Amino acid sequence: MAASSDSRNVQRIGFLLVRNFALMSYASATEPLRAANLLAGRPLYQIVPLAPGGGTVASSSGLSVGCADLESEGESCHTVFVCAGGEPTDWADTSASHTTLRRLSRLGIRIGGISSGAFVLAAAGLLDNRDFTIHWEHAPALKEAFPHLNPRHARFVLDGGIATCGGGVAPLDMMHAMIAERLGTDFARRVSDWYLHAAVAEPAAPQRGSAAERFGTNHPALLAVLEKMETAIERPLDRTAMARLAGVSPRHLDRLFREHRGTGFLDTYREIRLRHARRLLQQSPLSIPEIAYATGFSSPAHFSNAFKRLFSQTPGSLRRRSGS
């Protein structure tokens, strides 16, 4: 049975560490628990690093963490988070954990995913009909691998027995919510203040900066087009359609790109699509021709030539280096 959430008990919070897990995400999730113990003057939480069979797991920065065995120790945890990094080949190595994660979920243990950990939860079948999130960079690969799933663009999502978070520093916000859930908002505020985390974000807060910050412009017509470019990847819209969306003429749209971006409409759109393609090459199992068509190119050859011009390597060479 899942451990009690009674505030008098010590909650064991497990972290299933996937090889090359993101150390910042792990620290952002565990340090608030340590601070809660310190501020309360008694143990409220026990941090339990986990791995199949135990042993040590190295983070993306090379720091190794000693782990208990997931199978034998998971049942005593109140929550088990899957903490992963950015390498799909590492996510694939977690298949041996899927059965255990499903079993723990059936026992009433909350299961979570941090950074790309939601990909592992999806592969285990734990995200069907659930609200969840994942790091924005991994969302395209997840949607390609699991078309029936639709991650939310949120910093974190608490959906009953499932807790997911985009990673980075967002676990600070998620842990604030989870501590408040158990111990009240006043105590959670004390924990966040301990880390100078004064601006605690709401769950639905965005993971990324605004389009204006990302693209370095505040022009409303240009921003409308740039944001549409980020979503209209597989079936790119032509200049006329984009100009209509922005409420300007095609000629005016061209002028906006030259004046504010220093590059043309087509060049900007192509770069956005190619950067999306690069993420799919690194993180998805799609073939190169499938990625070419999924990013709006008329042929794999056209895609390969454009990719090489921008990144100075072919899609095939990047795929081999990524090990996908």
From Swiss-Prot:
One MF annotation (Gene Ontology) recorded for this entry: DNA-binding transcription factor activity
Domain of life: Bacteria
Known DNA-binding region: 240-261, 288-311
Keywords of this entry: DNA-binding, Transcription, Transcription regulation
Any one Pfam family match given in the protein's UniProt record, by short name: HTH_18
Domain HTH araC/xylS-type: 223-321
PANTHER family to which the protein is assigned, alphabetical: ARAC-FAMILY TRANSCRIPTIONAL REGULATOR, HTH-TYPE TRANSCRIPTIONAL REGULATOR RV1931C
Protein known as: HTH-type transcriptional regulator GlxA
Organism: Rhizobium meliloti (strain 1021)
Gene: glxA
